[in-house]
């Protein structure tokens, strides 16, 4: 039997809950045979798939080493922990949860420091006055170095943070920080604020593929099935299915509906009996229903879609293109 296809997912907390819910909505149920404490699982209906439950940072490491084919982790951890990330992994799809911004934050008392250019001036003056470099507390050493280098800032030193980074300036262990934030409330509570141009990265949980994994034909087929489910669910979220029947419908009317409401006719124009099926963005449903009735439709029904499978799978095409590079 060939080596298993490995999908690495978060092992605890909200990230695990959101990840399992995401795959469940796509028709891919993750399960643990040994119960909640088990760190290995399966996907119902997919043979030879091993679900590895790991910390988000461990997932990035496994992807980097080719020990997982696909993994769910934050882009911040990918960029921080994987050198030349764009060559070694591919961010296949943002998953819409796990949002966090990696930012440069300074004490609110620094009223004259609004930008990275201001910070550059302050770091130079700080070194001249105190005969030491300004300290930046962070867990994101590589992202910080790259961002500061891009802004020409050199008079600083990094203090690697083991605990709550936002408390470092108040504790006297650093002058400023680079950290993640979602609302900014924790930064504000610790007397910090984000520089106007201090956004290093807007991160979210991503489905990430590893170049160095064993992409056998069987592994590629497993990835195709998984990504087909995810793409079908994503398409379904974009539309509602609209059904109606009226003989007055023609190509010109469909063209107008497409241009005005963004609808698609996935099965072509109306049948000989006038039956018509359209896919419509949710925000345009009432406008479309009114338009159809104005042109002769007696009844217009709307149903939600679970999946919309197309011949083309953009997610798998993205993976294949990445592996060919």
Swiss-Prot record:
GO terms for biological process: L-histidine biosynthetic process. Gene3D superfamilies: Periplasmic binding protein-like II. GO terms for molecular function: ATP binding; ATP phosphoribosyltransferase activity; magnesium ion binding. The keyword Chloroplast does not apply. Pathway: Amino-acid biosynthesis; L-histidine biosynthesis; L-histidine from 5-phospho-alpha-D-ribose 1-diphosphate: step 1/9. It is an enzyme of class 2 (transferase). NCBIfam families: hisG. Catalyzes the condensation of ATP and 5-phosphoribose 1-diphosphate to form N'-(5'-phosphoribosyl)-ATP (PR-ATP). Has a crucial role in the pathway because the rate of histidine biosynthesis seems to be controlled primarily by regulation of HisG enzymatic activity. This is ATP phosphoribosyltransferase.
């Amino acid at each position: 039997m060939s080596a298993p296809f490995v999908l690495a997912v978060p092992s605890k907390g909200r990230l695990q809950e959101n990840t399992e819910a995401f795959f469940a909505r796509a028709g891919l149920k993750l399960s643990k045979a040994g119960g909640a404490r088990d760190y290995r699982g399966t996907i119902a209906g997919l043979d030879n798939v091993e679900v590895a439950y790991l910390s988000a940072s461990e997932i990035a490491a496994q992807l980097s080493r080719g020990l997982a084919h696909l993994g769910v982790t934050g882009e911040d951890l990918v960029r921080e922990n994987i050198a030349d990330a764009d060559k070694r992994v591919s961010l296949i799809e943002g998953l819409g949860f796990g949002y966090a911004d990696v930012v440069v934050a300074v004490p609110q008392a620094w009223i004259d420091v609004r930008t990275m250019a201001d910070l550059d001036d302050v770091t130079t003056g700080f070194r001249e006055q105190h005969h030491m470099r300004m300290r930046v507390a962070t867990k994101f050493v590589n992202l910080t170095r790259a961002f500061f280098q891009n802004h020409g800032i050199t008079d600083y030193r990094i203090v690697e943070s083991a605990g709550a980074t936002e408390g470092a300036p108040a504790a006297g262990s650093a002058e400023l920080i680079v950290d993640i934030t979602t609302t900014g409330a924790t930064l504000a509570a610790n007397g910090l604020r984000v520089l106007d141009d201090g956004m290093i990265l807007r991160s979210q949980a991503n489905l990430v593929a590893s170049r160095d994994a064993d992409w056998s034909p069987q592994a590629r087929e497993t990835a195709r099935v998984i990504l087909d489910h995810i793409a079908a669910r994503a398409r379904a979220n974009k539309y509602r299915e609209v059904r109606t029947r009226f003989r007055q419908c023609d190509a010109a009317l469909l063209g107008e509906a497409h241009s005005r409401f963004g609808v698609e006719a996935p099965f072509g124009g109306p049948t000989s009996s006038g039956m018509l099926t359209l896919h419509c963005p949710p925000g345009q449903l009432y406008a479309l229903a009114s338009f159809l009735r104005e042109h002769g439709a007696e009844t217009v029904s709307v149903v939600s879609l679970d999946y919309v499978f197309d011949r083309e799978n953009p997610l798998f095409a993205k993976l294949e293109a990445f592996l060919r590079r």
